Amino acid sequence: MPVLFAAATQNDLQFFNKVATKMEGLIFIYVFANTKWNKLEKELAEICTYVRGNNLIKFQNKINDLIDEEIADAKNNLVDPKYLQENYMKSKFVVHRVDFHIAKTLKLGANIKRDDFTLEHIIPQNSQEGLRKSTPPDTSIDEYSKLIHRIGNMTILSKSSNSSIGDSTPYEKIISYEGGKPQYDGTLIPITKVLIDGNLEVISGKKTAPVKFSNRYDLKKLNLYKDAYWSEDQVKKREKSFFEILSDIYGVNLN
């Protein structure tokens, strides 16, 4: 907070936004690295001095140095199933932050009520029957269940849609349910819609901003393992896309 107060004294919105986003990036890394907050407290005076002096370069360099000290632990925890299961709200932030950035950047979903959004696990989280049906025949259920809490297994749905598909498999959600349309069909939420048809929104043409964004971050429709199963390969590809987006937001390297 003192850093933002210092930035606000400059009466420069662009400067303030750059400082705020960089600080958000530092806090993001500290949260996922489980860094003790007194470490940041010791650096606040120096950070605020750079900000009050309108020295963006020194400020950014200082924050980058602090990030570099912790980023390895953060990156490990971002793909650690046990850590993510025990820190559900951190995972939730990642997915919602990516969704917010896409919507803001591309001006998508202005009519979507985001307070109706909830986190959805593509491999079902709370259904043993759903997990059993989702597991590939050449994989143990215990091993497959480790993917449930990975960030690449997460997307966003409306609360009403999420509550009705608890036992469903990824195939039923993404490809076809009972021979008809998939259960995610009809959603306008970009990171979920792209799973169905490869598009972030209802678009036409190949040079639109959403298509360029999709290509930039490789946000595309993913082929299922053996055309039927959501596997670690799809999870990793989705994580790579999400982490690339976050890397560009915060000016770090999360992949």
Spans of features found by a protein language model:
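A cross-family structural signal marking well-folded subdomains
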Residues: 1-95, 192, 197-199, 203, ...
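Short intrinsically disordered, low-complexity coil segments enriched in acidic
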Residues: 1-8, 117, 188, 222
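Betabetaalpha-Me/HNH-type nuclease active-site subdomain
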Residues: 52-197, 238-239, 243-246, 250
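C-terminal, well-folded lobe of enzymatic/effector domains
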Residues: 14-21, 28-31, 35-38, 65-70, ...
